[in-house]
């Protein structure tokens, strides 16, 4: 491979690596906060977020089928989708904590860990079952909001997507607020 080519793509690879690193930071932040409160690692942490994402996608699909995506401003649609996803994720997390984790707080440390792995498997299969029954296909192409797919060209060889900017800004804000508050 040519050295000039490597030097030319290095800034883009660096930006993509930083974005991925900030995604890992968000995941680690979530695990750390859950561990700090519950004092065990919740392996169902990501599945709870996936439920929120699927709720958002289902709302987005409902808006699309009703023709509302052309009428309602995208900022309002995004706000509705995010609030609904967060509300459902929060409710699912509370139910899981009260039914699967709280009764095991005084048990040996391995028992809640096994429970967390079981909850993770249960939620994965429940999501898979719901989506396959509801949509007849788990691998369905979902509509996206054009604003999230937009890319800003910084130079000829470097561009950044709105999704990457959202991840970076969210991670920086959350890490800063955790550090200072």
Name each region found by the language model.
Residues 1-38, 44-181:
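Small-residue-rich transmembrane alpha-helical segments that form helix-helix packing/gating elements
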């Amino acid at each position: 491979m040519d050295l000039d080519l490597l030097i030319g793509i290095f800034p883009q690879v660096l930006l993509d690596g930083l974005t991925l690193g900030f995604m890992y930071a968000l995941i680690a932040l979530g695990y750390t906060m859950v561990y700090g409160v519950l004092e065990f690692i919740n392996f169902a942490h990501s599945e709870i977020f996936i439920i929120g994402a699927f709720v958002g996608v289902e709302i987005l699909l409902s808006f699309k089928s009703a023709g509302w995506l052309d009428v309602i401003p995208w900022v309002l649609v995004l706000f509705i989708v995010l609030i609904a996803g967060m509300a459902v994720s929060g409710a699912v997390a509370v139910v899981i904590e009260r039914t699967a984790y709280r009764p095991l707080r005084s048990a040996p440390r391995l028992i809640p860990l096994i429970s967390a792995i079981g909850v993770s498997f249960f939620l994965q299969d429940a999501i898979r079952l719901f989506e396959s029954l509801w949509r007849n296909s788990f691998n369905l192409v979902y509509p996206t909001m054009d604003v999230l797919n937009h890319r800003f060209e910084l130079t000829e060889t470097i561009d950044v997507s709105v999704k990457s900017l959202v991840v970076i800004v969210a991670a920086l804000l959350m890490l800063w607020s955790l550090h200072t508050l």
